[in-house]
Design a protein with these regions (language model features):
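Coiled-coil phosphoacceptor/dimerization helix of two-component systems
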Residues: 10-21, 41, 84
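Glycine-rich ATP-binding loops of the HATPase_c
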Residues: 158-164
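Helix-loop junction within the histidine kinase core
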Residues: 22-33
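Short, small-residue-biased leader/transition segments that mark boundaries at the very start
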Residues: 1-7, 145
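Conserved catalytic submotifs in the C-terminal HATPase_c
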Residues: 32-36, 54, 58-68
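Short conserved segment of the HATPase_c
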Residues: 121-133
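Short alpha-helical Gxxx[C/S/T] motif in the catalytic ATP-binding
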Residues: 146, 150
Length: 186
């Protein structure tokens, strides 16, 4: 039946997420570093996800005029961003979803973010949103592990992850990673 197919997919996703988390934490997750043009990467994420975001939601990308290059694991960045964008899409019914990045030349960090005008997160729940099995809404699909996996990946990339949210107004999920290994463009 269709219901059992949905259940099977959710169970498989949960198992895969748990396996992914244990791989990361045991040190068995591999990271593959390469030079990444962040503008091209944001363009790619934008094109991929623009097909999944409902037409009534404005989808915006915000990048600096000049391309910026960092040495990182592009697949892991995409994994985090996909999680952020999927969550924004689940909880935003009108307004916009914005993805982009900013460079902080004083700290040698890149901050990558997704901002939305979704329902926001209640203040009392905000300290626990990056923990395992956190789900804002038990009726919305998902395992509650995506943000925990994202947090673990960001930690392995020597960065920080967080969220700023106002209930009823929206959220901004962000992570920062150092770019010192790639240097600044001339």
């Amino acid at each position: 039946s269709a219901a059992s197919d949905v259940y099977k997919r959710q169970l498989l996703k949960l198992i895969n997420d748990i396996l992914e988390l244990s791989r990361i934490e045991s040190g068995n997750m591999t990271f593959s570093y390469s030079t990444c043009n962040l503008n091209n990467w944001v363009d790619s994420m934008y094109l991929t996800h623009s097909l999944l975001i409902p037409k009534e939601i404005e989808f915006i990308k915000e990048v600096p005029d000049a391309a910026f290059f960092i040495n990182t694991d592009v697949n892991r960045l995409s994994q985090i961003m996909t999680n952020f964008l999927n969550n924004a899409t689940k909880f935003t019914k009108s307004g916009y979803i914005k993805l982009g990045y900013e460079i902080d030349f004083s700290t040698y960090e890149v901050s990558i973010y997704v901002e939305d005008t979704g329902k926001g997160i209640p203040k009392e729940e905000q300290p626990t949103i990056l923990e395992r099995f956190y789900k804002q809404d038990e009726f919305v699909q998902g395992t509650g592990l995506g943000l925990s996996i994202s947090k673990t990946i960001v930690n392995k990339l020597e960065g920080q992850i967080g969220a700023d949210s106002v209930e009823g107004k929206g959220s901004t999920f962000w992570f920062t990673i150092p770019y010192r290994t790639c240097g600044r463009p001339e």
